[in-house]
């Protein structure tokens, strides 16, 4: 099931005490009405968009029974707009007719999470999830003899001299027009990159 979250929840009280709420399924809004009888109605346009119906009006006409379709003035950012809402049976009809992969997780979200939680608690909200802490960087410890440490120092010294040597050789080969100048420059660049990484750590 994809990541589910609440976009917002707004209560809009009318004379008949209809409650409007807006939830999010995978960042897509779903406007829901809870009427005085305790029945849920879902915005047809929102549902059709999630389920992949390109023509929401046609989808509602073809797959929904008119007894479970109603129009309500719905609060929006600009003003109240008349929108079509469908009941639970019609919502299920749209889900089973959809060929989009999101249909199954959307059905589970609505009927197994949102509606049961609202009926039980009067609201729907996500359960807080514990953030995974980043894994600490792995550290290793080694033991060296005095001779091995001396060899490491000389190896580093030779490495540093190699950088300077490659830089001089590259200039000489480039002046001669040799094709080897590019390869030498590449090795010098790799040496410098390793040096830069080590000096940062």
Swiss-Prot record:
This is Uncharacterized protein HI_1418. InterPro entries: BRO_N_domain (IPR003497), Phage_P22_antirepressor_C (IPR018876). Transmembrane segments: none annotated. Coiled coil: none annotated. Residues 15-122 form the Bro-N domain. It comes from Haemophilus influenzae (strain ATCC 51907 / DSM 11121 / KW20 / Rd).
């Amino acid at each position: 099931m994809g990541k589910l979250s609440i976009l917002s929840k707004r209560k809009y009280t009318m004379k008949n005490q209809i409650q409007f709420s807006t939830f999010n399924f995978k960042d897509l809004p779903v406007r829901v009405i809870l009427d005085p009888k305790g029945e849920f109605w879902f915005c047809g346009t929102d549902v059709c968009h999630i389920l992949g119906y390109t023509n929401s009006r046609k989808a509602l006409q073809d797959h929904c029974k008119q007894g479970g379709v109603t129009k309500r003035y719905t609060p929006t950012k600009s003003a109240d707009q008349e929108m079509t809402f469908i009941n639970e049976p019609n919502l299920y009809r749209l889900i089973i007719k959809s060929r989009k992969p999101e249909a199954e997780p959307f059905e589970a979200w609505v009927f197994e999470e949102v509606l049961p939680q609202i009926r039980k608690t009067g609201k729907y909200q996500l359960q807080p999830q514990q953030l995974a802490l980043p894994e600490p960087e792995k550290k290793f410890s080694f033991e060296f003899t005095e001779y091995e440490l001396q060899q490491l120092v000389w190896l580093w010294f030779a490495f540093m001299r190699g950088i300077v040597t490659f830089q001089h050789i590259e200039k000489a080969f480039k002046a001669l027009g040799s094709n080897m100048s590019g390869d030498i420059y590449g090795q010098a660049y790799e040496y410098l990159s390793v040096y830069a990484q080590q000096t940062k750590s």
